[in-house]
């Protein structure tokens, strides 16, 4: 189900994503303290979100069970680059709930440089 969610997101036809969302779907963004209620609101928000080009989604990892899953996805429109960590709840073949985190990259503190290697 999560693979299909991201496949549909990659079409940039965000109303098509409604096919895998429950009508009472809820998405929570704890970092900005926002909640989106309903598959239609999810589609409209993504349709109206300003972008510099089509959104491209690169799946880094998906794991879980038929009822719960987690994905780590790189998202870009060619200018904006982000990483989404999404926690999915699935029931009756539909995504019913998501909690999504959009972590911001930051520079590592200098004082631990001798213990780590850079990821590029």
Give names to the regions the model predicted.
Residues 1-13, 20:
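Short, aromatic-enriched amphipathic alpha-helices that serve as compact interaction elements
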Residues 2-3, 29, 84:
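Hydrophobic alpha-helical context, especially transmembrane and signal-peptide helices
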Residues 5-8, 28, 72, 76:
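Alpha-helix C-capping/helix-to-loop hinge sites
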Residues 14-19, 23-65:
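A solvent-exposed, acidic/Ser-Thr-rich amphipathic alpha-helical stretch
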Residues 43-120:
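A beta-strand edge to alpha-helix "cap/lid" segment located at domain peripheries
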């Amino acid at each position: 189900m999560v693979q299909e969610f991201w496949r549909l997101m990659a079409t940039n036809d965000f109303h098509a994503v409604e096919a895998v969302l429950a009508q009472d779907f809820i998405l929570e963004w704890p970092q900005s303290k926002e909640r989106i209620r309903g598959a239609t609101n999810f589609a409209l928000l993504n349709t109206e979100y300003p972008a510099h080009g089509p959104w491209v989604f690169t799946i880094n990892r998906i794991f879980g069970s038929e009822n719960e899953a987690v994905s780590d996805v790189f998202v870009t429109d060619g200018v904006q680059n982000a990483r989404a960590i999404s926690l999915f709840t699935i029931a009756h073949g539909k995504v019913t709930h998501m909690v999504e985190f959009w972590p911001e990259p930051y520079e590592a503190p200098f004082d631990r440089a001798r213990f780590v290697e850079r990821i590029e």
